Amino acid sequence: MLENEDLAPLIDQQALAEFRNRALTPEHPVARGMAENPDTFFAHRESCNNYYANVPAVVEEYMEKISEITGRKYGLFDYYGAPDAERVIIAMGSVTEAIREVIDHLTAQGEKVGLVAVHLYRPFSAKHFLAAVPKTAKRIAVLDRTKEPGANGEPLYLDVKDCYYGQPDAPVIVGGRYGLGSNDTTPAQILAVYENLAMAEPKNQFTVGIVDDVTFTSLPQQEEIAMGGEGMFQAKFYGLGADGTVGANKNSVKIIGDNTDKHCQAYFSYDSKKSGGFTCSHLRFGDSEIRSTYLVNTPNFVACHVQAYLKMYDVTRGLQKNGTFLLNTIWEGDELAANLPNNVKRYFAENNIKVYYINATKIAQEIGLGNRTNTILQSAFFRITEVIPVDLAIEQMKKFIVKSYGKKGEDIVNKNYAAVDRGGEYKE
């Protein structure tokens, strides 16, 4: 992380002071642009052209300075992928990290694919953009995270089309939309974009992440693939709003992040009901940088903290072969076998899933924690997965208990200590 002292030499303090002195303030009132005739307004509006024209060079200069400090290359447009890529995606924002994951997967198989990540969108520098795109590119897909009904395309798509206007041997360019309303964008969807570019006539103005059965803009969904490489552990926790599952998982991430060299990531999804509603926690731990900017869809471990979810949601979806499943349930033995849905039992058998179950609800009531099963199930998670040494996990959990509940009295702390200790009462 850069400190202020690292960045201070890059800033022209005098220019910054002059800028602040021009700020509107009631202590030094000034009127600007109150009234202007048409002949001068138009001319004044165009007078800013040179300032905008100079912005790319200025930004590039400072990006080079930042690159020197961080050791990471930053440009107005950054290319990633095969040097002789024929199919290229143009995008900006967090989705570019997911695209990089897919590129690594495809180039390892000999595919000629790439990405141009946009860092300076306005003003859009055609010169820098064209320099970033490989000369070998034959097909380009431009991804926009917006929709402009009635237009011939979305903004970034039209900018890219304009860059190639009138050029001989220009690549085929199509546009698509993704991620509206924070809709998840997964590797399978990125794969669909590259597959679309490989078609004889790629679909233009396509969508990914939805099934559009009205106007048929959506691309066929590809099968999800596990990303992250060796050493990546992914987990999903299905819980009930206010049962403490989300809070416990936030603590788990802190425990692992603070006590190991592992990279950690946590996403949390909720429905609109909050308390009493559906929650799902998505955790990742890895030995290398985590570039997955989407919810976990191929977990190694799944915990279902509400047994009713077995018949309400597809809780085993994406669980990897030889993965682990933990169920909080009141059922045992033959009753458990009788109540598990057939599709769940079939998935367990076909994918060699290790299944554990625990009656955390009963344990919580015996301890005096009511319906707060979170600490019990968090303890079970650490014991089953051994993602970090169990003794270390238990020690750190108890430290977090003191930090979280210490002000509520020794009785509450001791009850949560008991919950940690009884987290080992699961059965296989």
Task: Write out the residue ranges for each language-model feature.
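Flexible inter-domain linker/hinge segments
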Residues: 50, 181-234, 413-428
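Active-site-proximal beta-alpha loop/turn segments in soluble metabolic enzymes
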Residues: 40, 44-47, 176, 402-405
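Thiamine diphosphate
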Residues: 60-209, 282-284, 299-301, 324-354, ...
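Active-site cofactor/cluster-binding pocket
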Residues: 123-124, 139, 143-154, 229-241, ...
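A glycine- and small-aliphatic-rich helix-loop capping segment at beta-alpha/alpha-beta transitions
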Residues: 2-5, 159-163, 251-260
